[in-house]
Amino acid sequence: SSTETPPSYNQLNYNENLLRFFNSKPVTAPVELDPPKVESSYVSSARGEDARSTLSPVQGFEGSGGSGSSGNFTTGSNLHMSSVTNTSNAGTGTSGTGNSGDGGGGGGANGTGSGAAPPVTLTESLLNKHNDEMEKFMLKKHRESRGRSGEKNKKSANEAMKMLEYSGPGPGHGHGIKRGGSHSWEGEANKPKQQLTLNTSGGGGGVGVGGGMPLFLDITHASSSSQNKGLAGVGVGGAGGVVGGGGSGTGLGGNGNVGSGNGNNNQPSTNQYTQSRLPCTQNINLWPPFSVGITTPTSVLSSHTAVPPSSFSPQHSLFPTFYYIPASIAASSPSSTNTNPNRPHKHAHVHNSSEKPSTSQAAAATMPLQYMTGVMYPHPSLFYTHPAAAAATAMV
């Protein structure tokens, strides 16, 4: 039978029926005995059996079956054998009553007092009832046996899953570690940016614009109000601001207050970038072009201080402004700024006419050198295109 449908009672019972039949050692009668005597012997033997024991009627029938082995009786016994199991120990093996003509005395096979038992007629309903009970019992056994095998399979499956779980965490945790490392690396890459923005609020703040504002807001505010806070180095992305040098160290870029920031801007303009950078770079100068005392960088820096909001606003979209000093602002600043009011205010020594080409050239010359170590930039093309844009804006 298929595993889906439970086997029938006869299928489950087949081997047990065969064993029970041959263990009973049936005694076959000579063929001379006629069927009526066989039937009488069956009745007498069944009368001697105890009806209350589950199998006694049937086993009495099978045990005395040897007494008359005429054709119809043996077929009947075989039919019952195929449908009835032997679970009680009514001694059918000894119940062969031999060849007695009337079959009397067959009840001795049952261990109980055969004579005292009330006569029981073996009916079809009794056999059906017995078969139903035994079928339930056999199906229960079958389910239990299948359940054991199913449990074994489940255990093996669970063990396999456990093995996978134990082996899984190796690569799984490896991925997790990689992810964690990447996140921490990204976090470290972003940390300078965050620190810069916080410091830039101080940077512009030291200049008097006040902390808490973004870098570009501080710078534009400072440059528009007195343009002395451009000293924070608008070109430097608020160099005083980037490092917070202006904000924290008022003695540096944004010396003192908003109005006085420009006073030192000439000489600290070069130092301002270096000194204001110191908090971020741990006293390591990462922007050599501005630390060198060359006239063109100073002029570039002086022009940075005078950048108005209009020239700086286009740079808001360039996220690297927090990372490096955008020299393009320096180039574009002279053309768009009111140099006359700013220059006497900032640097009287700067030449307005000659500064435009010098600033663009200086921007082009210094742009490739403005990378900060330890900072990721999107692509070099962004920076190499700035000088051209700066020159174009300067020519306007």
UniProtKB/Swiss-Prot annotation:
Summary of subunit composition and partner proteins: Forms a heterodimer with timeless (TIM); the complex then translocates into the nucleus.
Chain intervals with Gly residues compositional bias: 93-114, 253-262
Covalent S-S links between cysteines: none
Function: Essential for biological clock functions. Determines the period length of circadian and ultradian rhythms; an increase in PER dosage leads to shortened circadian rhythms and a decrease leads to lengthened circadian rhythms. Essential for the circadian rhythmicity of locomotor activity, eclosion behavior, and for the rhythmic component of the male courtship song that originates in the thoracic nervous system. The biological cycle depends on the rhythmic formation and nuclear localization of the TIM-PER complex. Light induces the degradation of TIM, which promotes elimination of PER.
GO annotation terms (biological process): circadian regulation of gene expression; entrainment of circadian clock by photoperiod; negative regulation of transcription by RNA polymerase II
Record-level GO cellular component terms: nucleus; perinuclear region of cytoplasm
Keyword Transferase among UniProt keywords: no
Localization per Swiss-Prot or TrEMBL: Nucleus; Cytoplasm, Perinuclear region
GO molecular function: transcription cis-regulatory region binding; transcription corepressor binding
UniProt main location, coarse: nucleus
Protein name: Period circadian protein
Matching PANTHER family: PERIOD CIRCADIAN PROTEIN
PTM info: Phosphorylated with a circadian rhythmicity, probably by the double-time protein (dbt). Phosphorylation could be implicated in the stability of per monomer and in the formation of heterodimer per-tim.
Keyword annotations of the record: Biological rhythms, Cytoplasm, Nucleus, Phosphoprotein, Repeat
Region (Disordered): 27-120, 164-188, 253-273, 333-362
Coiled-coil stretches noted in the UniProt entry, renumbered to this chain: none
Biased composition (Low complexity): 333-342
